[in-house]
């Protein structure tokens, strides 16, 4: 029986997605607030830098593991302000999270040119060569089979299409690393209990971050999936990294 990690626990591969779904369904209504509290607001700066990696907004963009829609809605607003003809597809396996994204899109009057699809990153319901950009922010570490998801990204991107991933990474500086680990394992779950009423969900999230491959390890995984010109950029001392690659 194939096993994989659900945080620090070993679980049957076929059960992980359901467990992850439960985590996000249980915290969906507090997700955005928790992001602000956990990152001390830094996630907004990280995401702003992330969308700068997309210079051409007259494009077909797929945002995978879209969650509450932060990345897609930032792109939609930027495109509207510049009068660009953007086409955005928001995909997430968790319907509750997509409901949050739809609500935000309506509230911000950004619903035009948006499509919403409930789908697994491992089995995307799109034809080959469909998108100019594939974005995924803080989502790929939750996928049961990351290699399979990377190959799907490769498949749905057009030739010369760009893969862009924002994910928690490995801090190298000693004093930052020590503080970050203490904050992650001791403070974040407590905030999760106080705000979202779910300490276990945030223990899983912290553990999943700790287990995610290093910047260089993930770069190799991306290259092995079939991408070229693979690179990454550290933000905030390596707390997160932006990974990018192209389809030739």
Swiss-Prot record:
Role description: Methyltransferase required for the conversion of demethylmenaquinol (DMKH2) to menaquinol (MKH2) and the conversion of 2-polyprenyl-6-methoxy-1,4-benzoquinol (DDMQH2) to 2-polyprenyl-3-methyl-6-methoxy-1,4-benzoquinol (DMQH2).
The protein, known as: Ubiquinone/menaquinone biosynthesis C-methyltransferase UbiE
UniProt GO BP: aerobic respiration; menaquinone biosynthetic process; methylation
Alphabetical list of InterPro entries matching this protein: SAM-dependent_MTases_sf, UbiE/COQ5_MeTrFase, UbiE/COQ5_MeTrFase_CS
Chain sites annotated for binding S-adenosyl-L-methionine: 68, 92
EC id: 2.1.1.163, 2.1.1.201
Organism: Rickettsia conorii (strain ATCC VR-613 / Malish 7)
Gene: ubiE
Molecular function terms, GO-annotated: 2-methoxy-6-polyprenyl-1,4-benzoquinol methyltransferase activity; demethylmenaquinone methyltransferase activity
Keywords, comma-separated and alphabetical: Menaquinone biosynthesis, Methyltransferase, S-adenosyl-L-methionine, Transferase, Ubiquinone biosynthesis
Pathway annotation from the record: Quinol/quinone metabolism; menaquinone biosynthesis; menaquinol from 1,4-dihydroxy-2-naphthoate: step 2/2; Cofactor biosynthesis; ubiquinone biosynthesis
Keyword Lipid metabolism: no
PROSITE patterns from the UniProt entry: SAM_MT_UBIE, UBIE_1, UBIE_2
SUPFAM superfamilies in the cross-refs: S-adenosyl-L-methionine-dependent methyltransferases
Reaction equation(s) it catalyzes: a 2-demethylmenaquinol + S-adenosyl-L-methionine = a menaquinol + S-adenosyl-L-homocysteine + H(+); a 2-methoxy-6-(all-trans-polyprenyl)benzene-1,4-diol + S-adenosyl-L-methionine = a 5-methoxy-2-methyl-3-(all-trans-polyprenyl)benzene-1,4-diol + S-adenosyl-L-homocysteine + H(+)
Annotated family: Belongs to the class I-like SAM-binding methyltransferase superfamily. MenG/UbiE family.
Domain of life: Bacteria
Segments passing through the bilayer: none
Pfam families cross-referenced by the UniProt entry: Ubie_methyltran (PF01209)
């Amino acid at each position: 029986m194939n096993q994989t990690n659900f945080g620090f626990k070993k679980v049957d591969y076929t059960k992980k997605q359901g467990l992850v779904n439960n985590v996000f369904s249980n915290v969906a209504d507090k997700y955005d607030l928790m992001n602000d509290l956990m990152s001390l607001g830094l996630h907004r700066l990280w995401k702003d830098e992330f969308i700068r990696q997309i210079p051409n907004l007259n494009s077909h963009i797929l945002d995978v593991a879209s969650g509450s829609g932060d990345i897609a809605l930032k792109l939609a607003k930027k495109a509207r302000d510049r009068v660009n003809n953007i086409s955005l597809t928001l995909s997430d396996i968790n319907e509750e999270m997509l409901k949050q994204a739809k609500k935000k899109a309506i509230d911000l009057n950004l619903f035009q040119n948006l499509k919403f699809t409930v789908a697994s990153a491992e089995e995307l319901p799109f034809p080959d060569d469909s998108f100019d950009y594939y974005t995924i922010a803080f989502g790929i570490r939750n996928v049961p089979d990351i290699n399979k998801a990377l190959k799907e990204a490769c498949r749905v991107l057009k030739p010369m299409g760009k893969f862009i991933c924002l994910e928690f990474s490995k801090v190298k500086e000693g004093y930052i690393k020590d503080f970050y680990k203490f904050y992650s394992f001791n403070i974040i779950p407590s905030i999760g209990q106080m705000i979202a009423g779910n300490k276990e969900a945030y223990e899983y999230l912290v553990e999943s971050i700790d287990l995610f491959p290093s910047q260089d390890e993930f770069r190799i995984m991306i290259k092995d999936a079939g991408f070229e010109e693979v690179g990454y950029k550290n933000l905030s001392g390596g707390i997160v990294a932006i990974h990018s690659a192209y389809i030739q």
